[in-house]
Amino acid sequence: NRMKTETRAICPPEHVWAIMQEPYEKGFSDWMVEGHDCFARVLTHHVPSNDPKYTASHPAIPWHVNRTFDQLTVCPVPEKTRGLSWVIGDAMDLPGHIRRWSFLEFIRKAGLPIDVYGKKIQYIEDKWDGLAPYRYSLAVENNSGPDCWTEKLADCFLAWTLPFYYGCTNLENYFPKESFVRIDITRHGESLEKIRTIMAGEAWEKRISALREARDLVLHRYQIFPHLSRLIAAQPEESMKKADLTIPPYRRSARAFWNRTGYKLKKKFGMLEPRR
């Protein structure tokens, strides 16, 4: 996220890394493409240049279900007594937020049986309760592009729930293709038909092994600790001199300022996403 305060550290400058965990949207998250001089390495799903400091990476956002690593590693498959759920946020800051709510409105009007949870809909204290009892759930990212998948997907896997997924365009590079079902929420009717067809075919029962593999990958490879540990271990073992470093907060450039101004105007006048 955007650095709002100054940070100090005593370490080699080569050991100062950043990992980007927000979707990139011009005028909304410009810190993802500028202000990186103090970082030796930037892990990001949106690589802004061919500078070798940039490494393509998923955001490695922590899971949101209220379970520890130890609990999740021994968790059996929960009893699946319900069909389809969607745990949805209430933000409306990005075009992806608007697309998501538009799709929710469509499937509700179409009469799709679904339990929807969220701060402004049906609040639940623990996201686990909106996933674990369900065979299927919708996992819809804030944007669509390579390498950008988040806890929206990981939480489904951890709860042994098959996700109808929209977002990361190269997700097959990370997880078994049978562990999720792709939908395109910009194609309302097509996505609705796919959801109905998959659920009618009892796909969840047939994909348990793929879900098991996917959740093991989340726990042991892709969550932030093993992810960073693997990257650090791959670094050359060199003796580097420590320094007293100051990492400044992000300050928008003039270009980013005007990008931000334009974005705010588009949001104010409802122009972030074309009306259907």
Predicted regions and their residues:
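Blade-loop segments of beta-propeller domains
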Residues: 23-25
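Active-site-proximal helix/loop microenvironment
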Residues: 142-144
